């Protein structure tokens, strides 16, 4: 028995992505967790090894404030970020990121990100869900198109918000909560108030959040207002969120309504853009550069839910609308010279936007059939209508004459980098989970999806692309998947999965037209893009007993027609060389790797846990895929009592040495130590504190610098040094 216990400890230390352990302080007991990855609630034990869950306790005790905090301790998952202005772009899962990752809130797709031609941040990112409103976050690592459609080519992230039933029921008809949090890295304060009520067949929830903060500090030491600056740019930000839910009905029939509004604003002094910069024979001296970025997301839902006792166990129908409105405005004052001759002295005012409206209707049913082979069938249909636009306007004022111009850097304004688009997507899907008498579970699934994209040109788009025409694109696909689960004794279960993926060209790739003669680059449209497709294989093993949990998985993904921005040549405007880029299909890209995780409660109150993730990514020319992460992991130790707990986590990564070019920055390896504690002195009060990067280590997150060329200011992209967070929660 002792040998078995020791083996479990060793496995936990060297294996892991602990269950429920993405936090500096973890609850020690191994308990079941419900996940919705298969569109049907089930315990984590029955889910494939590539599924993980981050729960509310984890989020609370990790002081999660944004997308990066949520996945901080999730090996193999990262968040590309630009802390100098834009913030968090989205999620990277197993080297695949951007809109190839399906991100949802309560099973409804959130708006797409827009990178604007490419950077590790995004002009419009996807960090637009308030973390204090989340009950849990389900993550599926790898393609999942059979159930979720073309957006799930690289994985799925479903953020599940809290519901009235999480606070009130017949036994407790009212709830009030207040939470305050502080984070030193950005000097931010956040306050969330929660009110919930229950009366007969009705229940309601209202959550209000307000946050205020500043720039996220890094380890850069140059604070000059010049291009040599390595400290993050000065910034003020504020945000608010409203989540309201109202449900009425009984145990069988229920009507559900939801309203959510998220707002985030950044005001940034672009200090690292000030001073003189050379562009060939031209020198630009910038004396003022300020940015104002705004994100507004609104979600409205209404639905009906049926819960039965016969073969039809559950059915629901949901109609929703989600609107995204972003503004990225800037003011820049500069003097342009060629040698000793002054070419211009002007101030530019830019007013850009990215807008997307999604309207949809989802229907789903769950049936159970008993017999020699037990069956659980999930089937449904979805319709989604998406409208996307990128309006841009700019005004340049000559500071000497007062003359006003609508032309800047070779572009006439107003313009649009891609035409307004309307996309209609219809899909049907079905999954049948067959459980045999010997415990073997075979789960085939199939989805059919039809996608139509129509664009419309106007003068604004023609200003950017004079030869542009309206474009129509239509494609459809069947995407199957097959999963096998085989019990191997009482404590072990083996898994094998095959799945296909499908993704139509996104709203901007085929039609983007953009040129910047000042910085010497242009993006050329490509109307011949094909839909991306993938074949994915996964093998895994799970282990569980009353005190321990472990899992290991290996994966191989092969992508065809992978859409990638490619340098296609050089043109000349005047005497200036212009590098031309275009989105093109790569014949094949492949990723493969392995992940392991474990958690072990080796003594009452004590838990050791850990996770590791290793992968490789290759492009069609054999060069490494820069977005593929280096070998990384997490190791944790926690002690928990009824009213208090302490814990520590070690986050580590090897050097990112596999890059596509010798000029690409290779992020050094690192080990970062975090500690935390929580205390519940009274039933209604809980306090928590965490210290991050205790050793004040200078390090880079791979996702923030993936594919970035080495420069003299790489410290600009470093993570925060030693910092702390504290929270206080009142619950009545």
Segment roles from a protein language model:
Residues 180-186, 199-201, 210-214, 250-252, ...:
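Transmembrane beta-strands of outer-membrane beta-barrel pores
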Residues 249, 254-262, 295-460, 469, ...:
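Face-selective signature of the C-terminal outer-membrane beta-barrel domain
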Residues 349, 358-367, 524-530, 536, ...:
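Outer membrane beta-barrel strand-and-loop segments of large Gram-negative receptors
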Residues 165, 173-179, 183-190, 194-293, ...:
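Periplasmic-side early beta-strands and strand-to-turn transitions of outer-membrane beta-barrels
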Residues 177-180, 227-232, 284-291, 303, ...:
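Extracellular loop and loop/strand-boundary signature of outer-membrane beta-barrel proteins
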Residues 21-167, 187, 509, 539:
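Acidic, small-polar-rich N-terminal luminal/periplasmic segments of exported/outer-membrane proteins
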Residues 437-438, 442, 450, 555-559, ...:
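Gram-negative outer-membrane beta-barrel transporters
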Residues 502, 558-561, 655-659, 679-732:
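C-terminal beta-signal and adjacent terminal beta-strands/loops
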């Amino acid at each position: 028995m002792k040998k078995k216990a020791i083996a479990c400890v060793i496995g936990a230390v060297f294996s892991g992505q602990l269950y429920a352990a993405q936090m500096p302080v973890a609850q020690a007991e191994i308990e079941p967790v419900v996940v919705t990855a298969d569109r049907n609630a089930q315990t984590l034990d029955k889910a494939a090894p590539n599924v993980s869950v981050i729960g509310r306790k984890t989020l609370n005790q990790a002081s999660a404030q944004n997308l990066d905090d949520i996945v901080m301790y999730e090996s193999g998952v990262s968040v590309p970020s630009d802390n100098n202005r834009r913030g968090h772009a989205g999620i990277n899962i197993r080297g695949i990121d951007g809109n190839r990752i399906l991100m949802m809130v309560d099973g409804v797709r959130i708006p797409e990100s827009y990178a604007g031609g490419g950077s590790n941040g995004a002009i419009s990112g996807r960090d637009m869900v308030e973390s204090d409103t989340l009950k849990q976050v389900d993550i599926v690592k790898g393609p999942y198109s059979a159930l979720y459609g073309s957006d799930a080519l690289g994985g799925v992230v479903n953020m599940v918000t809290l519901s009235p039933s999480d606070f009130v029921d017949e036994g407790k008809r009212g709830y009030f909560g207040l939470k305050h949090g502080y984070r030193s890295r950005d000097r931010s304060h956040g306050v969330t108030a929660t009110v919930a009520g229950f009366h007969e067949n009705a229940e309601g929830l209202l959550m209000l959040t307000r946050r205020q903060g500043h720039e996220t500090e890094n380890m850069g030491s140059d604070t000059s207002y010049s291009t040599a600056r390595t400290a993050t740019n000065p910034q003020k930000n504020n945000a608010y969120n409203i989540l309201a839910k109202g449900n009425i009905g009984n145990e069988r029939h229920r009507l559900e309504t939801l309203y959510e509004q998220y707002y985030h604003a950044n005001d940034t002094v672009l200090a690292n853009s000030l001073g003189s910069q050379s562009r060939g024979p031209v020198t630009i001296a910038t004396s003022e550069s300020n940015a104002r970025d705004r994100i507004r997301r609104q979600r409205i839902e209404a639905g009906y839910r049926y819960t039965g006792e016969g073969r039809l166990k559950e059915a629901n129908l949901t109609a929703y609308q989600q609107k995204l409105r972003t503004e990225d405005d800037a003011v820049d004052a500069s003097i342009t010279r060629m040698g000793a001759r002054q070419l211009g002295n002007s101030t530019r005012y830019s007013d850009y936007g990215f807008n997307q409206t999604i309207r949809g209707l989802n229907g789903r049913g769950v049936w159970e059939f008993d017999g020699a082979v037990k069956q659980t069938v999930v089937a449904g249909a979805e319709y989604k209508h998406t409208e996307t636009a990128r309006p841009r306007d700019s005004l340049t004022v000559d500071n000497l004459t007062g003359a006003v111009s609508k032309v800047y850097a070779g572009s006439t304004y107003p313009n649009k980098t891609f035409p307004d688009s309307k996309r209609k997507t219809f899909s049907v899907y079905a999954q049948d989970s067959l459980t045999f008498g010997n415990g073997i579970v075979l789960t085939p699934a199939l989805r059919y999806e039809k996608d139509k994209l129509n664009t419309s040109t106007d003068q604004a788009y023609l200003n950017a692309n004079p030869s542009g025409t309206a474009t129509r694109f239509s494609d459809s696909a069947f995407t199957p998947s097959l999963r096998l689960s085989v019990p191997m004794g009482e404590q072990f279960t083996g898994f094998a999965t095959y799945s296909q993926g499908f993704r139509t060209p996104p709203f901007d790739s085929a039609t983007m037209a953009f040129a910047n003669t000042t910085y010497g680059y242009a993006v050329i449209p490509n109307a011949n893009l094909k839909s991306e497709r993938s074949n994915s294989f996964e093998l895994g093993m799970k282990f569980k007993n009353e005190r321990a949990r472990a899992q290991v998985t290996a994966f191989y993904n092969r992508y065809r027609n992978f859409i990638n921005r490619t340098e296609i040549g050089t043109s000349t405007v005047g005497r200036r060389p212009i590098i031309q880029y275009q989105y093109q299909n790569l014949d094949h890209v492949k990723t493969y790797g392995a992940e392991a995780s474990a958690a072990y409660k080796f003594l009452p109150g004590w838990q050791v846990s850990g996770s590791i993730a290793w992968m490789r990514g290759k492009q069609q020319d054999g060069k490494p895929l820069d977005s593929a992460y280096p070998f990384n992991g997490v190791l944790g130790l926690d002690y928990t009592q009824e009213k208090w707990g302490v814990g520590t986590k070690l986050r580590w990564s090897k050097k990112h040495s596999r890059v596509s070019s010798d000029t690409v920055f290779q992020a050094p390896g690192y080990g970062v130590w975090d500690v935390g504690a929580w205390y519940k002195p009274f039933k209604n009060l809980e306090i928590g504190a965490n210290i991050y990067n205790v050793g004040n280590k200078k390090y880079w997150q791979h996702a923030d610098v993936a594919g970035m060329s080495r420069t003299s200011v790489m410290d600009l992209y470093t993570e925060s040094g030693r910092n702390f967070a504290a929270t206080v929660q009142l619950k009545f």
